[in-house]
From Swiss-Prot:
Protein name according to UniProt: Ribose-phosphate pyrophosphokinase
GO molecular function: ATP binding; kinase activity; magnesium ion binding; ribose phosphate diphosphokinase activity
Binding-site residues, Mg(2+) 1: H137
Taxonomic placement: Bacteria, Bacillati, Bacillota, Bacilli, Bacillales
Record-listed D-ribose 5-phosphate binding positions: R204, D228, D232, T233, A234, G235, T236
Amino acid sequence: MLNNEYKNSSMKIFSLKGNEPLAQEVADHVGIELGKCSVKRFSDGEIQINIEESIRGCDVFIVQPTSYPVNLHLMELLIMIDACKRASAANINIVVPYYGYARQDRKARSREPITAKLVANLIETAGANRMIALDLHAPQIQGFFDIPIDHLMGVPILAQHFENDPDINPEECVVVSPDHGGVTRARKLADILKTPIAIIDKRRPKPNVAEVMNIVGDIEGRTAIIIDDIIDTAGTITLAAQALKDKGAKEVYACCTHPVLSGPAKERIENSAIKQLIVTNSIQLEENRKPNNTKELSVAGLIAKAIIRVYERESVSVLFD
């Protein structure tokens, strides 16, 4: 717990159904109780939200990742924003540890939508004044919004784990990006750990032929740490782990901020060359979706510090610069 000075302040932290344990942990760090609200569903699936205390003139923070089920959690968030606006909240800040639809951030083919932008429009139209986000899949999503975005980074939390793990010697490690798009993220982790980086270059020679993984960098005899922002079905990450082992990596660890872990992910990871999977609790991970070799780190402290700085009108950049 950081302090108790906000117990009787105008700060209110609310949780919806997306990740209640994380929201409770954030409130505990800040030193206040979660705001009282109820989230119910009618028999036809419609959502009903009732704020059970006055928030007039308050700075409201709504903690809600738009993770699985994405559409349900997104609608909960939009309805809660509207409820806060109609209840005369002074500022409506949304805390979105995982931003669903972020992977639809551009038109990959003709006649496709840019759903990440649509979601931004919906959030703004509903009435949010600010968003605190964590490791957006594409940083340029910040530009989809006209409201302020505080973009927090999960890399320092992951790095701290590897620095403190007695089984890992950073001097013998190499940080691996599973694709070209993740090089910046891998470089940040490598800079903290003071290790070299490697990149996996995936190429498909022709249609219906398996991808060939070429590894750019020296990994032989080293402990490889694969880092990504999202692990979904775990196909790419497990193939990458095997390719690293085949090329002489001593051990392979994998880490990510957002453990979506859908479909066959659990089985794939447990049966892969990955020694341990390190994730954060940005998404509430049910036990039946969590691989046995998973280590979960908390982002609650980071989010709590961001909330306090926003409430105090202080710079948030010190948390990620």
